[in-house]
Amino acid sequence: MCISKEDEEDPSRNRRNQSPLSLPQTLKHFQKDLLAGAVMGGVVHTIVAPIERAKLLLQTQESNIAIVGDEGHAGKRRFKGMFDFIFRTVREEGVLSLWRGNGSSVLRYYPSVALNFSLKDLYRSILRNSSSQENHIFSGALANFMAGSAAGCTALIVVYPLDIAHTRLAADIGKPEARQFRGIHHFLSTIHKKDGVRGIYRGLPASLHGVIIHRGLYFGGFDTVKEIFSEDTKPELALWKRWGLAQAVTTSAGLASYPLDTVRRRIMMQSGMEHPMYRSTLDCWKKIYRSEGLASFYRGALSNMFRSTGSAAILVFYDEVKRFLNWGGI
């Protein structure tokens, strides 16, 4: 099968009327997908980093020793919300502290977003090619969801040490001399000495549960609604329509998976602790519900909705970056 020049230049073209790409052709586009995802991921995530840090602190403050305190530590007043976090952090630690943990986040996000996008397209092509014309089990929305989930799980396993480092550094509050970790290397080396490799990968099973839901809806939902709303006569949706659909899909995916994300962040906070608060993922669910109530699973969700604008931008402009790479012959 050959690909027309028009199809090559339009990565968002409706696939309903196209034959599936062969595996060699899919692999040929893998590197371009990787580059497009990396470009969008690092730039957008740096812009929304302060909101991301607010969200993480609100999620984890009930298991954050620096806030709740322990023997020898008095603790600090809890944050009431995103704006309370921003005002207090700027006043107590300076403006640049809003970006604390962003270095590890960008290091994580470049490969994570790049792998998510490229593998999502690769897995979807494999799933659709595995279905015959008479058997479309892995076509349409199901293939999109499964491809998004599989890509998310693969990428998470690869970058998980950076993911947990980002969470712990972002949740590490106070003046430089009072912080628990000095940076990525110090965090990883400290946790490895205390807990070994297990400590660096603490919370991975819980994280995979959330990624299956979030990435399946995030990638699969967006690809599906693009196909539904596209017209045969005009397969490419207008930019503003794609933005609206991306924002709706991103917000929905974030809310649906948010309790799972809260649990995984709480478990991440236990690496290096002598007396962990939670014995398992299930124990974490039970204790949060019993001691803090159902609302605690959604603490920081408003900040996450603001942050989702950045995630929506990645979905929308990913196609634009790919088109630019095609135009430039990269």
UniProtKB/Swiss-Prot annotation:
The annotated regions of Acidic residues compositional bias extend over 1-10
Tell me yes or no: is tRNA processing among this UniProt entry's keywords: no
Q: Where are the Solcar repeats?
A: 28-126, 139-228, 241-324
Q: Which Pfam families match?
A: Mito_carr
Q: Which reaction does it catalyse?
A: ADP(in) + ATP(out) = ADP(out) + ATP(in)
GO molecular function (one) = ATP:ADP antiporter activity
Q: Where are the transmembrane segments?
A: 27-61, 103-127, 137-171, 203-230, 236-270, 300-325
- Which segments carry the region annotation Disordered? 1-22
The UniProt entry annotates the motif Substrate recognition at 264-269
List the GO cellular component terms.
mitochondrial inner membrane
Q: What is its main location?
A: membrane
Binding of ADP occurs at 108, 120, 264
Topology of this chain in the membrane: Multi-pass membrane protein
Q: Which GO terms describe its biological process?
A: anther development; mitochondrial ADP transmembrane transport; mitochondrial ATP transmembrane transport
Q: What keywords are annotated for this sequence in UniProt? A: Antiport, Membrane, Repeat, Transmembrane, Transmembrane helix, Transport
Localization, per the record, is:
Membrane
**In UniProt terms, what function does this protein have?**
ADP:ATP antiporter that catalyzes the exchange of ADP and ATP across the membrane.
Among PANTHER family, the record links this protein to:
ADP,ATP CARRIER PROTEIN 1-RELATED-RELATED, ADP_ATP TRANSLOCASE
How does it associate, per the subunit comment?
Answer: Monomer.
User: Would you identify the family this protein belongs to, as annotated?
Assistant: Belongs to the mitochondrial carrier (TC 2.A.29) family.
Q: What else is known?
A: The transmembrane helices are not perpendicular to the plane of the membrane, but cross the membrane at an angle. At least 2 of the odd-numbered transmembrane helices exhibit a sharp kink, due to the presence of a conserved proline residue.
Q: What is this protein called?
A: Probable ADP,ATP carrier protein At5g56450
Question: What organism is recorded for this protein?
Answer: Arabidopsis thaliana
